[in-house]
Amino acid sequence: MSKVAVLLRVLPDDAETKPEELYKKIAAALPEKYQVAQYQAEPIAFGLEALRMVILMPEETEGGTEELETIIQSVQGVSQVDVLNVTRFSG
């Protein structure tokens, strides 16, 4: 079964929120069908760090990335979620 790899940039509410803390909250909020394949901090400016994530999800997910974006946006400490890339992934 093929999956889709979604590259996201997640911006925190403020500069005090660290990417590692944000990652833990997001990972805990994601349903089982979503898998975090990779994550890293991305410096933005003035001490603000975004979180870049690659999340694997089933290819046949109805509505594309909308559900994933909504779940992450609802996590406390998240200000904005940007989908940077979506690609098919098999393996």
Curated annotation (Swiss-Prot):
<dbReference type="InterPro" id="IPR036219">
    <property type="entry name" value="eEF-1beta-like_sf"/>
</dbReference>
<dbReference type="GO" id="GO:0003746">
    <property type="term" value="F:translation elongation factor activity"/>
</dbReference>
<keyword id="KW-0648">Protein biosynthesis</keyword>
<comment type="function">
    <text>Promotes the exchange of GDP for GTP in EF-1-alpha/GDP, thus allowing the regeneration of EF-1-alpha/GTP that could then be used to form the ternary complex EF-1-alpha/GTP/AAtRNA.</text>
</comment>
<dbReference type="InterPro" id="IPR014038">
    <property type="entry name" value="EF1B_bsu/dsu_GNE"/>
</dbReference>
<protein>
    <recommendedName>
        <fullName>Elongation factor 1-beta</fullName>
    </recommendedName>
</protein>
<comment type="similarity">
    <text>Belongs to the EF-1-beta/EF-1-delta family.</text>
</comment>
<dbReference type="InterPro" id="IPR014717">
    <property type="entry name" value="Transl_elong_EF1B/ribsomal_bS6"/>
</dbReference>
<keyword id="KW-0251">Elongation factor</keyword>
<dbReference type="Pfam" id="PF00736">
    <property type="entry name" value="EF1_GNE"/>
</dbReference>
<dbReference type="InterPro" id="IPR004542">
    <property type="entry name" value="Transl_elong_EF1B_B_arc"/>
</dbReference>
